[in-house]
Amino acid sequence: MRRFLLVVLAAFSLLILPLGHAGSLDAAELQPLEIASKSGVHVFAVEMASTPEEQAKGLMFRRQLPEGQGMLFDFHQEQPTSFWMKNTYVPLDMIFIRADGRILRIAENTVPLSETLVSSGGPVRAVLEVIAGTCKKLGIAAGDRVTHPIFSGR
């Protein structure tokens, strides 16, 4: 009976373990990022997506994204890029950032689960995804400066 209970407990643990990552990002993986806008400096805690595998998954399958957190996709060099919202359940603001840390373009309030491509509108080094409404609420706009170690203009 004891062995049976241990097996059931182990199986249950494996089932609920992935749920812990469905919401907020793991604090051990978060890095600070700042955006200086006309309304002030805004600090975010971001998870890095630097490998092709991390970038392909992105924020897919997550059911929530807390305010002040996000995911930073680092392409390691400037390039035009496009994103979609396939398997992404929360609406996002996508912030397209040049290598010098300047915001090139923002796609606000993207539609969850949409397979419509959202273009960077030019070459970018990175894309920051945050919860929809963040840019409007904080007054973040194209031309604002992002500070993080991956950007040359830090």
Task: Label each PLM-derived region with a short phrase.
Residues 7-20:
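Bacterial N-terminal signal peptides
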Residues 1-4:
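Positively charged n-region of N-terminal signal peptides that target proteins for export
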Residues 23-154:
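Compact, glycine-rich, soluble single-domain proteins
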